[in-house]
Structure formats: C-alpha cells, structure tokens
Amino acid sequence: MAVHHSTRPFTPGTAPLVSFAEEVFGYLPRADQRRWAHAYLEGLLSTPGKKTVRRLAAAVSASPTASQSLHQFVNASPWDWGPALRSLAHWTLRRTVPRAWTIGTVVMPKRGESSVGVHRRFDPASGRTVNCQVGVGIFLSTETEPVPLGWRILLPSRWTDDDTLRERARIPESSVGDRPASAQVLDLVHTIHSRTTATPLPVVADMTSCTETGSLLRGLHRTGCDFVVAVPASLAVLPGGRTRGEAQDTPVPVRRLVYQGDGFGEVPALLGAPGPVPGGQPRRLLNTLVRLPERPGARPGTDTTPPVLRAFARRVPGRQADEPVWITNLTRHSAEELIALTGHHARTAGALRVLEDDFGLRDFEGRSFPGWHHHMTLVSAAFAYSRLADATAARTDRPLAVVRSA
C-alpha cells in the first residue's frame, strides 16, 4: 500500500495560490468555476491520504454542499482543459531550465466497468492482469523535477466502437478511431508544440511495452523531433551506415545488432551513468547505426528514405538482459549526452510515483472523459505549484545544450 505524505508545507488560502489559480484557470467564464478550481487545488495540496472529492471538499469548506459542488465542477461542468494546460506550460517554462520532453504512463486500477476507458490488461509493474484505466502524460523535464503538462487516456475499441458507451462517457468524436499508445504520444508531442514556443527539446520515452514503436519513431522523424526512445528488444531494424546488400536488407531484432554485432564499437567510461555496476566493473556503451524497414503494407518506393539512427545500450556485466535498448536520431552526440538524456525517463517515473502517492493522480472517482481530463489537469497544476511556486520567473527561450543532428 502506498504511503501518503505531505510533500510541501502549505497554508490554505495563501495569496500565491490565489494568483496561480487565477493565472491558470482565470479563463473559465463563471466565477463559481474559478472558485472551485482554486478549491480543488487547495484540497489537493492540503489533504493527506486519498484525494476523494468528499475529503477535498471537507478540507476547504464547511458547507454541506461543497462536496456536491466540487463533484459537479470536475465531472459535469463543460469547461475546456486545453487553455489551462497552455497557461500551465507557460508558467512552468518561465521558472525552469527545460531539458527534454518525457513520456510517462500510469496504470489506474478500477473496480467495475463504468469508468471511461476501463479495460483489462497486464500491468508489468505488478506482474498481474488488472482492471484499469491507462493514462499517458507528457512532462517537461527540467534541471530539478519533471512537470506534467498534458494527458491522454487510452481508449480500447470497446469504448470507441459502441455509440452508447461513447455517449454515456462523453467521448468526443476527435478521440474515436484507432488510437494506440504510439498515436497518443505523437498527439501529445504535437499538442505541446502548438502550446509553447520554447526551444525545441528532444523527446525521451520508454516504449518497450509498445507494439507500434516503429510507427512512433517514424512519426517523430516526420515531425522533425529529436528523440531518444527505449524500444522492444525484438524491434526489427536494418543495419545502417554500411553499403546496402542482400544481407543488410533483412530485418533483425535490434538487440542482436547492438549486443552481438561485429565491430560496431563500444564507448567506455560513462561517468555519472545511472545505476550501480556489480563489483566496480566498468560501464560501456554498445552502439550501432540502424535503419527502420519500410512500413508494413507500404508500396515499394512510397516511403521516404529511412533515416540512419543510433541504437545503443549500456553493457553492465551481470545484468545484461535488464538493460533497455534505446534508439535515437541524435547520431552525433557523445555517450555521456545520450545517457544523460535517458536519465530523464527515470526521473519522470519518480515524479509519477509522487503524483500517485501525494497528489491523487489515481483517485479520480468520476466516469466521464471530460471529468478524467479535468482531474488530471488539476493534479498537474497542483504538482507544478508545489514544486515551482517559490522559483523566480525568467525567460522561456533559454537555449538547450543539445545540438541537433544534421
């Protein structure tokens, strides 16, 4: 069972929170909506333990109708969460040194089948098949801590093909159709780019459990994004950077090329790379150039020339099978730079645990699609405030210490 604890001293009704709530949610057209947005934030920041609507309401109001009003605001009130996330992104960028966009996934166990997006799936973290919702978030990874700035909920075909379920959960037409995890990540990246004008940042993601990783890499390449993505060990790739011939046109698992390739080279002495090394043995980085095969079903010659990418993995004696394989288009970066970027994923996983334990990320009690997004937006705002309220606002266009590959 998770241990809930307060992450930051908080005094209810403080002027900084009032100002923050007005900056992020001031666009809401009605005064009562703005008031309940502030109340929800205050409740998330001050309520220990599980963040049910009833407990949040009790923390901020003595009114017997507060719980009903707060529930109405989150689950039934038809407000657009997009402007709040746009304002939150601008507020966050002014107070941080951005390093990367990272992708985090959260599995939210649920009872029953009525909550939007609920389905059964295997959860690698628990090793069990669970009844759950699955959320995918995009985080701004900074010099201090990642901050969530956008969310998508995975909707299996049961939820998108059934008109009755869609109407009951208020799922918009724009979210209907084949929307696997890779498409949701691409949509998050596109949306965050449309909301900010910050210096372009690399996208860092662990997609080792995703069956459409190739589609994600192609999509990121098409949009001009730099990326560092952990991929399934079985992902089929072609050797890159060598004269193409019959042998080089046969796709092979990426792990085989990285770990068993002949003469692809190693980069020694990765100072500061995350994770212990058994017996003080040296870390080394195995790496090789690869290309993605043409898309399945694509007519010959219709795909653009596949880019040359770098696949790499740490070689750590004694735990080789546990090391993920990463693919990046930052082919000119040093081993130290690449390892530093992969470290942002671990930090995002840590931020997700804090969001779950201390900010009620998994405590949404409603059933609708808008309600889920309202809750996730408010949780994101509360988390950002708890981490950055004391930071000094500065310019948003700081240069990133990453040189784009040619």
Identify the meaning behind each predicted range.
Residues 1-19, 25-33, 155, 244-298, ...:
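A short, flexible helix-boundary coil/loop motif
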Residues 2-71:
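Gly/serine-rich nucleotide phosphate-binding loop at the start of the catalytic core
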Residues 56, 99-109, 138, 201-210, ...:
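Short, conserved catalytic/metal-binding motifs centered on acidic residues
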Residues 78-157:
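Active-site-proximal, Lys/Arg-enriched surface segment
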Residues 107, 257, 332-366:
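Short amphipathic alpha-helical "interface-anchor" segments enriched in bulky aromatics
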Residues 126-197, 322-323:
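Electropositive, glycine- and tryptophan-enriched low-complexity nucleic-acid-binding patches
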Residues 146-147, 159, 228-232, 237-344:
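An anionic, glycine-rich sequence signature occurring as long contiguous blocks
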Residues 169-241:
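Domain-level cores of phosphate- or acyl-group-handling catalytic modules
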